[in-house]
Regions:
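Conserved catalytic-core segment of nucleotide-activated headgroup transferases in glycan assembly
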Residues: 7-58
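Leloir-type glycosyltransferase catalytic cores
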Residues: 1-9, 106-155
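Alpha-helix capping and helix-coil boundary motifs
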Residues: 26-33, 62-66, 70, 155
Length: 155
């Protein structure tokens, strides 16, 4: 987990969702979504924008993965509901999530927040990572009631 530090010269990294995701959530195509986001961002920032399309599965384990992209001069990540939001947060970059996902509890949810995105200390991010880890269950744990018991204990 990397602490967050935001120099001024950074760009906004847009990680568009897949077509499959957008169809499921009854949203515009990824291309339309991206153009809409870029247009709205111009109302709030003059930062440069870079677009990172989701790589194919075999490319995600190579040097072109999101963690590599986050090592560049990223001010914040904007996505719909990609795991990129979680990866950004865990790598010290704030994220704006415009749709539901596991990171929404920590993400900003409006493009108007792009210049002052919420950042978190290491302790908060460690707690978030632990929470995500603790919410992972095996098929057996779901079938035998372990998952349900743990979820009820923590609510």
């Amino acid at each position: 987990i990397t602490p967050c530090a935001l120099p001024r010269t950074l760009f906004v990294l847009i990680c568009p969702p897949s077509d499959k995701v957008m169809k499921f959530w009854n949203q515009p195509t990824p291309e339309e979504w991206t153009q809409n986001v870029i247009k709205e961002l111009k109302n709030y920032t003059d930062r440069p924008v870079e677009i990172r399309l989701k790589p194919k599965r075999n490319e995600r384990i190579a040097d072109g993965n999101i963690i590599h992209a986050l090592q560049n001069d990223v001010h914040c990540v904007v996505t719909y509901n990609s795991i990129a939001a979680t990866e950004a947060l865990l790598n010290g970059k704030p994220a704006i999530a415009l749709g539901p996902n596991a990171a929404t509890v920590l993400c900003n949810t409006s493009l108007s927040q792009v210049e002052n995105p919420t950042t978190f200390d290491k302790l908060t991010m460690e707690a978030y990572a632990a929470h995500l880890t603790y919410c992972q269950f095996t098929k057996q744990e779901m079938q035998d009631g372990t998952a349900w018991r743990i979820l009820n204990e923590s609510s």
